[in-house]
Amino acid sequence: EVEEPKTKISASTAEASSSRISSAKMTADGTIKLGDQSPLKQSEKDHPVSWDFKLVQSLRNEYADERYISRSAMLDQEMNVVNLLELIDNLQRLGLSYHFEDKIRSILSGIYNTIKMRNPEGLYATALEFRLRRQHGFYVPQEIFESFKDENGDFNHSLCEDLKGLLYLYEASYLEKENESNLEMAREFTAKHLKKILKEKRIDQELEALVQHALELPLHWRMMRLEARWFIDIYEARSDRNPILLELAKLDFNIVQAIHQNDLECTLRWWSSTGLAEKLSFARDIMVENFFWTVGTISDPQHGNARRLLTKVAALVTAIDDVYDQYGTEDELELFTSVVERWDVNSIDQLPDYMKICFLALFNFVNEMAYDALKEEGVNIIPYLRKAWADLCKAYLQEAKWFFSGHIPTLQQYLNNAWTSISAPLVVVHAYFCVDYPINKDHVEYLEKCHKIIRCSSMIIRLANDLGTSPESEVLKSADVPKSIQCYVKETGACEEKAREYLRFLIIEAWKQMNEAQTVDSPFSSTFKGFAVNVARMGQCMYQHGDGHAHQNSEPRDRILSLLFEPISSFA
């Protein structure tokens, strides 16, 4: 039972507290090299925590108050559906669509007509319908855009006069599946002309912000909770805003933020109880960042238990990653991997002290999660969780072996291991047992075969990680575990920029397969499939401006503050 916090603070106090938090510094040292330049994993330098946990636990805003929740329900009743497609789009971007999931699906299921009937509505409406229906798993053929081409099969240049339509076609193109040349052409055509229009300043201020935002990262790739915070400000400045919808969005954001703060407080108490921060002084102590990851993957308020469990998973992954990446010797790592694989608590006396507490923390967490599943669902999930952790540790061990030997694998060898070592498959397996009820053994076996949506999600986050954590000009000199850029450069002889370009191409290809996997029938719930997609989105988000997970530059910190600690200001 979560104890009711004794301290509530206003938005202004939260802002002041947040500025104190943001002044904290964090360093994350990689591999150390001695004077002889031999690789050394043992690190005696502690990692200072990146957030003041006592201050974090005191943060509250008044929007957890019951009267705001009641007001939110009242606003729901007052809403009028005027333009269905635009309303659905606004609900999604404002972070409100989870209130109306069944209604939205019913609407999208009912509005589809033949291609010829939709085309007269113009590029904007056609692109919007295409994007929304594909997002929700409905079949929509790429040929819906054929009528917007000229006799040569190219998109009509007259479309450039419809800036909003051009923008929405650009966003729709990122719902592309494999072998959809129309959408690939659409993406290239729209990106080229939107950049030109921006450069020539032939655009109004309201649309300019949307275009710049989309060109930086398309909507389909964005973390939706963060997008909601950004879009609320954009929507408020619009002349056609719906004041009821705007107020509901602000209230809902603040209410959900208060719920998230409560979840964070619970996980901070758990983390403190493990003692890992004190015993593993070499490891990163980044619970707030771990929680931010989880919020990005499953933010809806009703999934609090899943958020808390998955944040614990992320914390254990971070600690074990640092054992392999920063501290353990090769012999120690082989021994730890063996103990995890055998799941043998009686063997921990063979481990050094820092590994004993690490394994016991993992062992206790998995058994506790499995106990709850057995009690509530009657299913023993320990074998599945054991396998997921063993697979992760074996992938970490392979990377450590490459490091100690100085070996740089081929790109394919690297990726075959790295899509597991990024930890996404492990997180997704745990998520299944948090969000898909009742647990079905046949579904779990299907999950164990690594359904395409899981592999694609993992590959996207791995490639985004490698692009973000490999600073330009430093990547080829790194003494760390080789990343995909080094592997590609060594294998092909290409320059670093060509390697980055190829990785960006692989990300687009993985998204195509992900889009396909979302529309194919599978035994998984829409919530679970959405989680897998959101894992990929978090990869794009966290590594968009470098390594937002490990190094606290201003952009990731500002995002965390706005999402977790700063309520939206009071209404006029």
Curated annotation (Swiss-Prot):
| UniProt GO MF annotations | magnesium ion binding; myrcene synthase activity
EC top class, as a word: lyase
Residues of the transit peptide: 1-27
Residues that coordinate or bind Mg(2+) 1: D321, D325
Xref: Pfam families: Terpene_synth, Terpene_synth_C
Cellular location(s): Plastid, Chloroplast
- One GO CC term, this protein: chloroplast
The cofactor note from the UniProt entry for this protein is: Binds 3 Mg(2+) or Mn(2+) ions per subunit.
Alphabetical list of InterPro entries matching this protein: Isoprenoid_synthase_dom_sf, Terpene_cyclase-like_1_C, Terpene_cyclase_plant_C1, Terpene_synth_N, Terpene_synth_N_sf, Terpene_synthase-like, Terpene_synthase_metal-bd, Terpenoid_cyclase/PrenylTrfase
GO-annotated biological processes = diterpenoid biosynthetic process; monoterpenoid metabolic process
> Can you tell me which residues bind Mg(2+) 2?
D321, D325
Give the EC number(s) under which this enzyme is classified.
4.2.3.-, 4.2.3.15, 4.2.3.106
Q: In which tissues does this protein get expressed?
A: Expressed in flowers and fruits.
Disordered: annotated segments = 1-45
Q: Which UniProt keywords apply?
A: Chloroplast, Lyase, Magnesium, Metal-binding, Plastid, Transit peptide
UniProt superkingdom:
Eukaryota
Question: Motif DDXXD motif: residue span?
Answer: 321-325
Residues annotated as binding (2E)-geranyl diphosphate: R284, D321, D325, R462, N465
What role does this protein play?
Answer: Monoterpene synthase (mono-TPS) involved in the biosynthesis of monoterpenes natural products, constituent of coffee beverage aroma. Catalyzes the conversion of (2E)-geranyl diphosphate (GPP) into linalool and beta-myrcene, and, as minor products, cis-ocimene and trans-ocimene. Not able to use geranylgeranyl pyrophosphate (GGPP) and farnesyl pyrophosphate (FPP) as substrates.
Subunit architecture: Monomer.
The written remark on domains in the entry is: The Asp-Asp-Xaa-Xaa-Asp/Glu (DDXXD/E) motif is important for the catalytic activity, presumably through binding to Mg(2+).
Record protein name field = Linalool synthase TPS2, chloroplastic
